[in-house]
């Protein structure tokens, strides 16, 4: 059989056309050393800082150090699966996490993978974990309140949407309790249909015990608060790299709400452990240590995170992201490195004192050194009307109280002021997991400031408050409704309230 040259050419052309020549170029390096969650890699010449690399076992790493002859990466997972000599691939991607409403009600790890056993998360959108904070023009001033449901905070240290308010105190003083109460208190707004009233909550557990996180999840489920809450967990047993990236991942999840005209609240519990995780990574990467062995950029670590909380302008959809970072102090030392850093970044702080806590003043807020630098603009008028003088009265009471320890015979005016102060302290006490609606808080504080409690024995103040609120809910609901709707105490409402209280005090004292 004789083949014609033209036929041969046609066959060859067909075969060439069918050849799949889509070859992929991969940049591959090798692990030189591995240990303590850090891998030194040789051969990735074009890798970028912050890029994700993939090890042979499928474990991911995050490049943080670019050196002359090698690259330092933190391993996001089990470093036992990475061995010396393993190949490492560039992915040419930066870290991304799933965002959106599909995450609500779920517990995820620092990379956004579900860890609650409820199946996959059907999220359509992903965001980078490191996003630039909004610029000056894109923001507007804080003007709407975030109601925590805690009398001592909503009246004296008000928090606004888009604010960053630090909760600081020793261990076991009730820092997490304030945060959890604030989440539970948003349930009331979520029962309404108006989207602008709702605040979606994100709780980030950094370096905590797994049992503590499980307890918080259970508490939120029991209170029906998980429907609008997302929990990001990077517990103490997880890699330092995951504890380091958890707040940034959670912040990106919160920014989804902020940038889509909704409102979100994010709680970082706590940034002391976050700084410790970052210090561990930095020292293992052989970066030079500074004060308290923290690296030089530990301020930037927290500032770039907290600057992402903002109240957006109308042109940008008027959304907001409010941040409540938590810092744990050692023996009340607020002047340590990390506490002073975070105090200077935030818009105020709620300082919790162990001494007050042990005295039974709970929440143990030290009103003297707690401030809210921007929140008063967000406080509703009714609260301003009743709470304006409370801070001063409490400060005077503390001063007179310490003074009265030395002098036994006090003049009647001083004694009356001390008694009034003690009753104010009592009225600001509150049980855990029992947030109050703002209109009920206003009535309670009105009772305290207008001296209706003068005839009530101090040990019966809580009983008086409980009975008074029960009575007003049942028989004088119009007073509460008026305060809630008008957002101020009108003359008519005040007359009704005065008449009700005078009557109630007489009955109670009898």
Curated annotation (Swiss-Prot):
It is found in: Cell inner membrane. It is a peripheral membrane protein. The keyword Manganese does not apply. One of its GO terms (cellular component) is proton-transporting ATP synthase complex. It catalyses: ATP + H2O + 4 H(+)(in) = ADP + phosphate + 5 H(+)(out). InterPro entries: ATP_synth_asu-like_sf (IPR023366), ATP_synth_asu_C (IPR000793), ATP_synth_asu_C_sf (IPR038376), ATP_synth_F1_a_nt-bd_dom (IPR033732), ATP_synth_F1_asu (IPR005294), ATPase_a/bsu_AS (IPR020003), ATPase_F1/V1/A1_a/bsu_N (IPR004100), ATPase_F1/V1/A1_a/bsu_N_sf (IPR036121). One of its GO terms (molecular function) is proton-transporting ATP synthase activity, rotational mechanism. It is an enzyme of class 7 (translocase). The keyword Cell membrane applies. Transmembrane segments: none annotated. ATP binds at residues 169-176. It comes from the Bacteria. It holds the Pfam family ATP-synt_ab. Keywords: ATP synthesis, ATP-binding, Cell inner membrane, Cell membrane, CF(1), Hydrogen ion transport, Ion transport, Membrane, Nucleotide-binding, Translocase, Transport. PROSITE patterns: ATPASE_ALPHA_BETA (PS00152). The record marks 370 as: Required for activity. Its EC number is 7.1.2.2. Belongs to the ATPase alpha/beta chains family. F-type ATPases have 2 components, CF(1) - the catalytic core - and CF(0) - the membrane proton channel. CF(1) has five subunits: alpha(3), beta(3), gamma(1), delta(1), epsilon(1). CF(0) has three main subunits: a(1), b(2) and c(9-12). The alpha and beta chains form an alternating ring which encloses part of the gamma chain. CF(1) is attached to CF(0) by a central stalk formed by the gamma and epsilon chains, while a peripheral stalk is formed by the delta and b chains. Produces ATP from ADP in the presence of a proton gradient across the membrane. The alpha chain is a regulatory subunit. PANTHER family: ATP SYNTHASE SUBUNIT ALPHA, MITOCHONDRIAL. This is ATP synthase subunit alpha. It comes from Rickettsia massiliae (strain Mtu5). The lineage of its organism: Bacteria, Pseudomonadati, Pseudomonadota, Alphaproteobacteria, Rickettsiales.
């Amino acid at each position: 059989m004789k083949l014609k040259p033209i036929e041969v050419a046609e066959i060859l052309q067909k075969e060439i056309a069918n050849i799949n020549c889509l070859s992929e170029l991969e940049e591959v390096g090798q692990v030189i050393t591995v240990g303590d969650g850090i891998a030194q890699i040789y051969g990735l010449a074009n890798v970028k800082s912050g890029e994700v690399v993939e090890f042979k076992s499928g474990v991911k790493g995050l490049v943080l150090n670019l050196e002359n002859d090698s690259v330092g990466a933190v391993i996001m997972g089990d470093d036992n699966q990475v061995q010396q000599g393993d190949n490492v691939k560039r992915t040419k991607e930066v870290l991304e996490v799933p965002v959106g409403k599909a995450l609500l009600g779920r517990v995820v790890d620092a990379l956004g993978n579900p860890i609650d056993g409820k199946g996959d998360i059907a999220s359509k959108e992903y965001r980078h974990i490191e996003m630039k904070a909004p610029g000056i023009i894109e923001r507007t001033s804080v003007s709407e309140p975030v109601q925590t449901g805690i009398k001592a905070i909503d009246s004296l240290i008000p928090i606004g949407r888009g604010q960053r308010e630090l909760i600081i105190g020793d261990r076991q003083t009730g820092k997490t309790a304030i945060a959890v109460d604030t989440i539970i208190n948003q349930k009331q707004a979520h029962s309404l249909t108006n989207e602008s009233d709702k605040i979606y909550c994100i709780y980030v557990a950094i370096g905590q015990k797994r049992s503590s996180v499980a307890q918080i999840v259970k508490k939120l489920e029991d209170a029906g608060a998980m429907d609008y809450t997302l929990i990001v967990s990077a517990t103490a047993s997880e890699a330092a790299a995951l504890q380091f990236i958890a707040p940034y991942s959670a912040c990106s999840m919160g920014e989804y709400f902020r940038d889509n005209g909704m409102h979100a609240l994010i709680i970082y519990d706590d940034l002391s452990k976050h700084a410790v995780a970052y210090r561990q990574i930095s020292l293992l990467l052989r970066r030079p240590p500074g004060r308290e062995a923290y690296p030089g950029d530990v301020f930037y670590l927290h500032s770039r995170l907290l600057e992402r909380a903002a109240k957006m302008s109308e042109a940008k959809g008027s959304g907001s992201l409010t941040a409540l970072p938590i810092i744990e102090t050692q023996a009340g030392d607020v002047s340590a490195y990390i506490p002073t850093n975070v105090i200077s970044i935030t818009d105020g702080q709620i300082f919790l004192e162990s001494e007050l806590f042990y005295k039974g003043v709970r929440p143990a807020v030290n009103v003297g050194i707690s401030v809210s630098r921007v929140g008063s603009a967000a406080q509703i008028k009714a609260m301003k009307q009743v709470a304006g003088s409370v801070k001063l009265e409490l400060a005077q009471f503390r001063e007179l109280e310490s003074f009265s320890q030395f002098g036994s015979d006090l003049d009647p005016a001083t004694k009356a002021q001390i008694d009034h102060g003690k009753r104010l302290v009592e009225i600001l006490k509150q049980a855990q997991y029992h947030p109050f609606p703002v209109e009920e808080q206003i009535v309670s504080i009105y009772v305290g400031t207008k001296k209706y409690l003068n005839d009530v024995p101090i040990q019966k103040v809580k009983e008086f408050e409980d009975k008074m609120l029960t009575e007003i809910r049942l028989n004088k609901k119009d007073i509460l409704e008026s305060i809630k709707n008008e957002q101020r105490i009108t003359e008519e409402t005040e007359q009704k309230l005065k008449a009700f209280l005078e009557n109630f005090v007489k009955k109670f004292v009898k």
